[in-house]
C-alpha cells in the first residue's frame, strides 16, 4: 500500500490492478498520485491495464477507481475524482491473430479474407470468434467468467458472480 510515497515519478504502471487481494488499490493510488504531480503541474502518467477478478477478489477496488475516472464527472478544478481517465478496449479489438498485414483489427467477418501479420488468412472476424466461444459454453458460471475475462464492454468486465443468466 505504501509504495512510492515520496519519489517523483514520470510513469507508474499498476499491472493487473483488478486482481489485488492483499493490498488496497484505492489506498495505493491515493499514495502514488501525488508522486506524479508537483503543485498543479502533472509530470507523470499512470497506466492500470487489467482484466478483473470477482468483485470480492479485488475487482471491487478497480471498479471504484473506474467509476471515479469518468471524464463526465469532474471536480471544481477540472479533474476526475480519481485524477485518471478510464479507457476500455473490447477483447476483440487488437486480439492476436486478427490483425491484418497493415496493422488493422479485423473485427467483423470479412467478405474477402485479408492476410494476417502472421501470414495466415483471417476468415472470421475477432468478434464472431468470441461470440462462437460464448455460444459453445453451456455452464452459466463458466460463461460469466468468460465474459469477465474476455469482455465486450466495461459492464461485462465488472460482472458480479451473481450475474449468471445466459440471456
List where the protein language model places each region:
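Structural recognition of the conserved hydrophobic beta-strand(s) that form the central parallel beta-sheet
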Residues: 42-51
